[in-house]
């Protein structure tokens, strides 16, 4: 999945070894909570840049992946920042850049209500570098939702 702006991750594969749920819209990327309870949500997102960085990131640029409840009220449930190399060699070099390839892992437990809708999002937060989500070597993206109670 090639992206360069903030977006919801869509177009999921649910064939073996992955699995589907009647609550998951793999095309739109939305999971609708079937029953009120406690849920474990996990995601592993591999990525790679599609071009070399030519400038340093600004201090406020912190791209991330977020599992967000989009309905009934938009709420970030868990987020993970991209790994950033932050180098400052006095009077010579000040560099801040995302790694060319990396992995962001998200995990948490949440009290959710039947009918809540959640999705996995890329939040660019000022990053304009094109990304290949899933990584250059097809390591992929996996996210799962499990009811605990």
Report the location of each language-model feature.
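Extracellular jelly-roll beta-sandwich "head" domains, especially the C-terminal globular C1q domain
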Residues: 1-149
């Amino acid at each position: 999945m090639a992206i360069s702006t903030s977006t919801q991750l869509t177009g999921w594969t649910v064939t073996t070894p992955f699995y589907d749920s009647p609550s998951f819209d793999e095309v739109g990327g939305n999971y609708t909570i079937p029953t009120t309870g406690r849920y474990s949500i996990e995601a592993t997102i591999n990525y790679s840049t599609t071009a070399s960085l030519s400038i340093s990131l600004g201090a406020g640029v912190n791209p991330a992946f977020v599992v967000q409840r989009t309905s009934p009220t938009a709420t970030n449930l868990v987020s993970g920042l991209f790994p950033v190399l932050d180098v400052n060699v006095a009077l010579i070099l000040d560099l801040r850049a995302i790694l060319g390839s990396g992995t962001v892992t998200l995990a948490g437990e949440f009290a959710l209500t039947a009918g809540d809708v959640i999705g996995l999002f890329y939040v660019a937060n000022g990053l304009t570098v094109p990304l290949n989500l899933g990584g250059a070597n097809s390591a992929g993206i996996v996210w799962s939702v499990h009811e605990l109670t």
